[in-house]
Amino acid sequence: MSVHHAAYIDYALRVTENMTDVMTGSDTVTLKSYQHFVSRVFLGLDKMHSLLLFHETGVGKTITTVFILKHLKDVYTNWIIILLVKKALVEDPWTYSITKYAPEILKDCIFITYDDKNFHNKFFTNIKTISSRSRLCIIIDECHNFISKSIVKEDGKQRPTKSVYNYLLKNVALHHHKLICLSATPIVNSVKEFIMLVNLLRPKILNNISLFENKRLINESELINKLGAICSYIVTNEFSIFDDVEGSATFAKKNVYFQYVNMTQKQEQVYQKAKSAELKAGTSSFRIYRRMAATFTFDTFLDKTDKTPEEIVNEQVTLYKDFEKFIKTKKFSDHALSHFKKGQSLNGTSSADDISFLNELREHSCKFTDVCLRILASPGKCLVFEPFVNQSGINILLLYFSAFNISYIEFSSRTKNTRVQSVAEFNKRENTNGDLIKTCVFSLSGGEGISFFSINDIFILDMTWNEASLRQIIGRAIRLNSHVLTPEHRRYVYVHFIIARLSNGDPTVDEDLLDIIRNKSKEFTQLFKVFKHTSIEWIYEHQTNFSPVDDESGWGALISRSIDENPTTKRVPRIARGQNIWYSHSNRMITVYKGFKTDDGRLFDSDGNFIQTIQANPVIKIHNNKLVYVLD
């Protein structure tokens, strides 16, 4: 049916043939061709009531959306624009971009923050004040967060955001409104998020069907057939975050490194106590104690058993102050700092005080110490991701920065009032090489909605629970023209995963989380392929043999067909002859996978999904006593 979708896309482009690609307010911007294409299709099809902008970070989905909002009155005269966004993103990029390029629509905009505890009340209060003569255009920025907040919890308790989700699902199409969802990572934690997002865009089209069987998408063709034109897909980097990516004229190259650092004996002892405490408390599945212990440990493990919250806080404050006092009484000599900046270790010419101080810092945190040394040796600016803010997180990391004389800004929940301006200072042209501010340390607050320029090194100190969050984090530093001011030989971003390691070789919490991320991504990759093949770009490029239409009267029926719950096309198991092999997508073999190669050269992953056909003379390397096929 995609050929029919192509006919309507063609119709929309004919209707908007004379639409300008220039947007002017107090400043002027010319849209990229892909931005203009999306805008023309969405505005040219008045009955296209919803669209997902699945655009990777840095390609300008905010500007695309502002352009659409600016031209809504080309379609209908009375619009109220409701922007559902995170608090951190109201000012920049949204208010900033609208004021700069479409100030005339600001009076029609209502900002409602979905991370506000009173979000649903504010939403419905505003809805009641809107005239029935006005059409709504609802924007959901970082829609994966909105969807996640709308999922019913395991205890069955409905979350407040779900009532807004239900309202939009019921009323957008019914009352001829429009909805745009934006995300660089539309699925983050579970397949249920895909189902909820699709049903928001195409109400009740999926129902409660099971999409996977043994981690395989049951009927990919049926989904692609029925979900045509559900999204715009602008993703040039489809590689895993763990793979190297070559640079281009507009994007910096990316190399990934796994930096394994050994815990000291003291840190190992505290780590094992943290593990025991998790088992005792029944919280081992969350791994919080181990994650913190793998990052930093005080002289003693803070046992929370039989203690009041006040006692725990007081003990934490005491431990922090003791460590802070220790840090402030010592400093590295210029000689030591000079060695660190050259990437050199302390040696026989170094003072006993410098060597002792470095060892003491490493005793408490192998990861913080390693990162500080790497920051000093980096030729440019650095980003450091640390999800924990208090206790053993950013609070302590900044003491390490002080010890190593590293200049920094902080972007976290505790710097709400200053962080936007701090990023602006960090991004200034005169700080291209990090001469004024070397590093930005950020928590999950910095994973979305902000951009960094001329970054050379990113350090991931602690894993998130999914690849999507890590992709967002890395994407903040690798954006369109993000390195245009950087010297050509430094137009790269090195991503360092800092992984704590135990002396006995047992897997640490860092390694456990890496495995979880990789397993989740297998299903998500298949769903992202569905989005790609149902995008307006893919359809318009590949479905060219269509009969033109002269109106959009048939659009509604085309997009409202339900997914077949009993697909007729099923996989037929077949036996293939071949051998188990190891393979990698990277020449440097950052990640090595187990697969199966058939006698005729077809490669399948461990779940039976086809990867590619291996060339006649493949590149095979030896890695950790394994023969590894390097895929091109």
From Swiss-Prot:
ATP binds at H55, E56, T57, G58, V59, G60, K61, T62. Its main location: virion. Residues 457-524 are annotated as: Binding to the cap-specific mRNA (nucleoside-2'-O-)-methyltransferase. InterPro entries: Helicase_ATP-bd, Helicase_C-like, NPHI_C, P-loop_NTPase, SNF2_N. Gene3D superfamilies: P-loop containing nucleotide triphosphate hydrolases (3.40.50.300). Disulfide bonds: none annotated. A motif (DEXH box) lies at residues 141-144. It holds the Pfam family NPHI_C. Residues 42-204 form the Helicase ATP-binding domain. Residues 367-532 form the Helicase C-terminal domain. It comes from the Viruses. Keywords: ATP-binding, DNA-binding, Hydrolase, Nucleotide-binding, Transcription, Virion. It is an enzyme of class 3 (hydrolase). GO terms for biological process: DNA-templated transcription. Its EC number is 3.6.1.15. It is found in: Virion. GO terms for cellular component: virion component. It catalyses: a ribonucleoside 5'-triphosphate + H2O = a ribonucleoside 5'-diphosphate + phosphate + H(+). Belongs to the helicase family. NPH I subfamily. DNA-dependent ATPase required for providing the needed energy to achieve the termination of early transcripts. Acts in concert with the RAP94 subunit of the virion RNA polymerase and the capping enzyme/VTF to catalyze release of UUUUUNU-containing nascent RNA from the elongation complex. NPH-I must bind ssDNA in order to exhibit ATPase activity. PANTHER family: SNF2/RAD54 HELICASE FAMILY (PTHR10799). Monomer. Interacts (via C-terminus) with RAP94 (via N-terminus). Interacts with the cap-specific mRNA (nucleoside-2'-O-)-methyltransferase. This is Nucleoside triphosphatase I.
